[in-house]
Curated annotation (Swiss-Prot):
Residues 849-950 are annotated as: Deaminase domain. Changing R650A: Loss of auto-proteolytic activity. Pfam families: TTc_toxin_rep, YwqJ-deaminase. Part of an orally active toxin complex (TC) with strong insecticidal effects on larvae of the Coleoptera Costelytra zealandica, Acrossidius tasmania and Adoryphorus couloni and some Lepidoptera larvae. The TC has an endochitinase activity. The gene is yenC2. This is Toxin subunit YenC2. It comes from Yersinia entomophaga. Residues 610-690 form a beta-strand plug which closes one end of the shell; the other end of the shell is closed by the 5-bladed beta-propeller domain in YenB. RHS repeats lie at residues 168-182, 297-311, 329-343, 361-375, 408-422, 500-514, 580-594, 606-620, 640-654. Residues 610-690 are annotated as: RHS-repeat associated core domain. GO terms for cellular component: extracellular region. The keyword Secreted applies. The record marks M690, A691 as: Cleavage. Semipurified toxin complex consists of at least YenA1-YenA2-YenB-YenC1-YenC2-Chi1-Chi2. YenB and the N-terminus of YenC2 form a large hollow shell of beta-strands. The shell is closed at both ends, within which the C-terminus of YenC2 is probably found. The C-terminal region dissociates from the YenB-YenC2 complex at pH 4.5 but not 7.5. The Yen-TC:K9 subcomplex is about 26 nm tall and 22 nm in diameter with 5-fold symmetry and 5 copies of YenA1, YenA2, Chi1 and Chi2; the chitinase subunits may be solvent accessible on the exterior the complex. Keywords: Autocatalytic cleavage, Repeat, Secreted, Virulence.
Length: 970
């Protein structure tokens, strides 16, 4: 790596006199032209109230085209958005902050006015007072069509039977776009124990749409098919799920160690014997996986870099004594640059081969520009590989053993100043597999298509819907979208007078796919493949004509360590050459791509290697029939017959390195709504199509914090961000209860003599004087589990920064503070105010880090918990990043309520998954107990530095939280 490439390329932010960010400047250099530096400036404009009004990216600002324009209400809530990528949207809220009307798919006419001809309007209905204001229904209307009620919520009453099932007040019937979700019972901790799904009749017909008119549930139920798919779970006393029985009766069981981490898992097929999936899992003191052994006897070990704790090795092998013989199956070794970009990946389990005067090493190497965008990649591919497109290459069968099947390749990537991937140049000289893939990008947006569709940038926007969804995949392949922006149908082959080849999809109320139907004409008959997605189960059938040719149940193991484990159980139509109830362990790489498949005997089924942005470079298997049943590939996502990958909220085109539609979460990853993982697919991955995640838990960008707004706007009933808005309301009510208890206690203390008052107040948790110490109340939601985990009641822990009883390890720095500036003390802040670095209350130095950390541990212990190693590590990192000098206003780093909430998520044994997964599914809320009480309390400078990973801070951070720099020498 050339260090000079990155020299003098800082990220610069320019603020106006109000402290608002008006310019973001980045400097781009390419390693092939290190002396050429391109200045990339993103512009922001704010209105007179300080609310964002416009944003322009480095490319479109030269054309005087605004990427985003916003119109806000008096409180700063965005009510109207103009986007060159995603079209225009209108959102109106009620006085409670709930969405009432949302209008999408608004295009801009040639006259500059909004074109509502294809607009979609959604209206939301809620309970009236004195009921708690829960959602009742959602109405959807496409302009010119009749309105349909697409969602309906039915809540349990208060009968003895409902109480016995813990259903009182719960949403027990949710009618959505796919049918009905019925909750039959709930645990004491609030986790659903029995959930049933019923589908609409004739759901395979994409013209059949849900419409839950009226209030007659019997009329609604008449629209449903008779089949019921019920999932049953069992939990322990703390609410952790122990067993899950899927819709056909297969049972998954898990066990946890004393720290609450997964230690083993088992599967019992319906009518069968229990079998081991994960035999044992061991972890480091920091909670990182060290070793896992599967039920097939295959062992995976993990190696981490001591200084950074980055994952540098994943070794999968059959150990000595294995029935199939000892063998290293995969041995991935990672090398990084200082900031965590992957420089090389080597598979030491593979041999170096020689063919046509070239040395073919099982290694991939990568180079980046100064913005950490991938600009070149080299590796090996199958010698017969052709130009990458939407089709998979033919697999090598059987698994190769000679040197004539692999050759070296190099790929280079070219981007414009807005981050659009413009060109992929592929070179494999030994096989003359040289080609260039060009992407044509609009001159007035970031919309882009393969040049095979058009080479004229002026024609690109016409190939997209008003809301930014691509209308054509390849020449002759039309894309049809639902009013909600979900891909409904892909026309693969249009035949005119005879039936077409197509693939269609149906979604639930959270826009998650529940059904896929593929139709193909063969020999004058139609072959229809159907995949129904249920919790822990994929039900796949194939019919030829009127007869059912195959009935396959794919059991998806929810807890299987790093591997994805799938069991293939045929009810009928099992093909020859594959056993029934075959268990397939799929071992992933750093970005979750499925590289190695192994069966229950520890024998290799298939191996696959990928180009950086997707696409298959190497694919080999022991038999052709087994390759047909590999559906999960790049990034651990399902690949459809279209060649697209389904991520959850969007579809991805691996041959173009672009998303098929604009980001539904908005600008969470910048102004370009089609860019894939910031053009760094080796370091970043996208779990659901909304925002990239750094699985190395490296620094996050400020842009990622905009996801808070998107999460609230989505207001999911189900899905990865489910229940966040409702939890915010719950958190607000909990804070209100603390304040009310304080008032009640003060009323009791009123009139009592001072001596008696002090004695009486000792037994009270909340009084006015104690609230000044607590200052803040925090809560946290985690949605990683099938049943979300919520906890509040976190309060600031005491830690003195006074001259008396100074916190251990702290040395006070006596700055002179003007009396008038005391208004900025947290206890006296009113509405959320901007952090003013030059107006702080002084600084303190952590002179003895170990004494400081010991003091924090002691405070956590006194509150009834232990400081987790991950949180302690973040506190230490925060100290190091600030040269051990911190602002007094921010208090003792690590003692605030929101950091305790973070500590709870990491430590809670009821939450499964690794640290990255736990944090990604966590939402932290903090509210004031002093000053402007019961209002959002932005995370202070210290908390923002500590809560700096994948977790979502839903109540904001102080402005400039990462830019406070002390320029004075102490």
């Amino acid at each position: 790596m050339d260090i000079q490439l990155f020299s003098k390329t800082p990220s610069v932010t320019v603020f106006d006199n109000r402290g608002l960010s008006v310019r973001d400047i980045a400097y781009r250099r390419h390693p092939d032209t290190p002396k050429v530096t391109e200045e990339c400036i993103t512009y922001h404009q704010f209105d007179f109230r300080g609310f964002l009004a416009q944003s322009l990216d480095p490319r479109l600002n030269h054309k005087e085209v605004t990427n985003f324009s916003y119109l806000t209400d008096l409180n700063g809530n965005i009510i109207y958005t103009q986007s060159v990528d995603a079209g225009n949207t209108l959102v109106l809220n009620d006085t409670e902050g709930r969405s009432v009307i949302a209008m999408t798919n608004i295009s801009r006419g040639e006259n500059g006015k909004d074109d509502l001809s294809l607009a979609v309007t959604r209206t939301f209905q809620y309970e009236n007072a004195p009921l708690p204001g829960r959602p009742l229904s959602v109405t959807e209307q496409v302009n010119g069509e009749n309105a349909r009620i697409t969602e309906h919520f039915v809540y349990a009453g208060n009968t003895p039977q409902e109480k016995n099932l813990n259903l009182a007040g719960q949403c027990v019937s949710y009618y959505d776009a796919a049918g009905l979700i019925q909750t039959d019972s709930v645990s004491l901790t609030g986790k659903p124990l029995s959930v049933s799904r019923k589908l609409l009749k004739n759901l395979d017909d994409t013209n059949i749409l849900a419409d839950w008119q009226g209030n007659d549930t019997s009329a609604w139920n008449s629209l449903l098919a008779t089949e019921i798919y019920t999932t049953v779970t069992r939990t322990d006393a703390a609410g952790a799920v122990l067993t899950t029985i899927d819709a056909v009766g297969n049972q998954q069981r898990v066990a946890f160690d004393i720290a609450g981490q997964l230690s083993a898992s088992w599967l019992t097929l319906k009518g069968g014997q229990e079998q081991v999936i994960i035999k044992v899992l061991t972890y480091s003191a920091a909670g990182q996986k060290l070793r896992e052994e599967g039920g097939n006897g295959v062992v995976t070990t993990y190696t981490y870099e001591a200084e950074t704790q980055r994952l540098i090795g994943i070794k999968t092998e059959r150990p000595n004594g294995h029935a199939a013989g000892a063998k290293v199956l995969q041995d991935l070794r990672y090398e990084y640059d200082p900031v965590g970009n992957v420089l090389s990946i080597t598979n030491d389990a593979e041999e170096t081969r020689f063919w046509r005067n070239q040395k073919v090493v099982p290694e991939n190497a990568y180079r980046y520009d100064s913005l950490y965008q991938l600009v070149s990649a080299s590796g090996r591919e199958v010698a017969g590989a052709g130009q990458q497109g939407s089709d998979l290459p033919s697999p090598l069968v059987p698994l190769p053993s000679d040197s004539s099947v692999y050759t070296n390749y190099t790929r280079t990537y070219t981007y414009d100043s807005a981050g659009n991937l413009m060109r992929i140049r592929h070179s494999a000289p030994a096989t003359n597999n040289n080609y260039t893939l060009n992407i044509t990008v609009s001159e007035r947006s970031n919309r882009g298509v393969m040049s095979s569709l058009t080479e004229n940038p002026a024609d690109v926007d016409a190939l997209f819907t008003a809301s930014g969804s691509q209308k054509c995949l390849q020449q002759g392949q039309s894309l049809i979208w639902t009013p909600r922006g979900e891909l409904r149908t892909v026309l693969l082959v249009a035949r005119g007078e005879t039936a077409d080849d197509s693939e269609s999809y149906r979604y639930d109320g959270s826009s998650q796919r529940i059904l896929k139907i593929s139709s193909q004409q063969t020999n004058h008959s139609a072959r229809v493949q159907r995949a129904l997605y249920l919790p822990g189960l994929e039900w796949r059938t194939m019919t030829g004509g009127v007869a059912e040719a195959e009935n396959l149940q794919v059991i998806c193991i929810g807890e299987a360590g790093r591997a994805q484990v799938r069991v293939l159980h045929w009810e009928s139509g099992k093909p020859d050459g594959i056993i029934n109830d075959q268990i397939r362990w799929s071992y992933d790489n750093l970005t979750c791509s499925s590289g190695l498949e192994v069966d229950g005997d520890g024998l290799v089924i298939s191996m696959e290697e990928y180009y950086p942005y997707g696409g298959t470079a190497v694919w080999a298997a022991r038999s052709h029939i087994e390759t047909a049943y590999k559906t999960v590939r790049y990034s651990g996502k399902e690949r459809d017959a279209t060649g697209l990958y389904y991520y959850g909220f969007r579809y991805y085109q691996p041959w173009a390195g672009r998303w098929l539609s604009a980001d539904p979460a908005g600008t969470v990853d910048g102004l370009n709504l089609y860019r894939m993982v910031r053009n760094n697919p080796l370091r970043l991955t996208d779990p659901d199509g909304m925002a990239p995640l750094d699985w190395l838990d490296l620094d996050t960008t400020n842009a990622s914090r905009d996801i808070v707004k998107a999460i609230y706007q989505l207001n999911q009933i189900d899905g990865p961000h489910r229940g966040v808005r409702d939890t915010y309301q719950r958190m607000t009510e909990s804070t209100g209860m603390i304040l009310q208890e304080t008032l009640n206690n003060e009323a009791v203390l009123k009139g009592i003599k001072q001596k008696d008052k002090e004695k009486k107040s000792r037994g009270m948790k909340f009084t006015n004087s104690k609230l000044k110490t607590y200052a803040a109340h925090a809560g946290v939601l985690n949605t990683l589990q099938p049943d979300p985990v919520y906890k509040d009641g976190f309060l600031n822990l005491p830690g003195s920064l006074g001259n008396k009883n100074t916190f251990p390890g702290v040395e006070l720095i006596e700055d002179k503070v003007k009396p008038s500036l005391s208004q900025y003390h947290p206890d006296k802040l009113g509405k959320s105010q901007r952090w003013k670095p030059e107006s702080s209350l002084g600084y303190y130095r952590v002179a003895d880090t170990e004494a400081f950390i010991t003091g924090i541990r002691s405070q956590y212990k006194s509150s009834g918990t232990d400081l987790h190693a991950v949180v302690e590590g973040r506190i230490r990192d925060h100290l190091l990043a600030n040269n051990n000098v911190l602002p007094k206003m921010a208090g003792i780093a690590g003692l605030h309520a929101e950091v305790q909430a973070l500590n709870y998520i990491i430590s809670n044994p009821d939450i499964e998954g690794g640290n990255a997964e736990r944090l990604n599914g966590s939402y932290i809320f903090t509210q004031r107990l002093v000053g402007d009480v019961n209002q959002d309390f932005p995370a202070c400078y210290n908390c923002s530095g500590i809560i700096s990973g994948l977790e979502n801070v839903m109540t904001g951070r102080v402005n400039n939280d990462v830019r406070l720099k002390r320029r004075k020498s102490f």
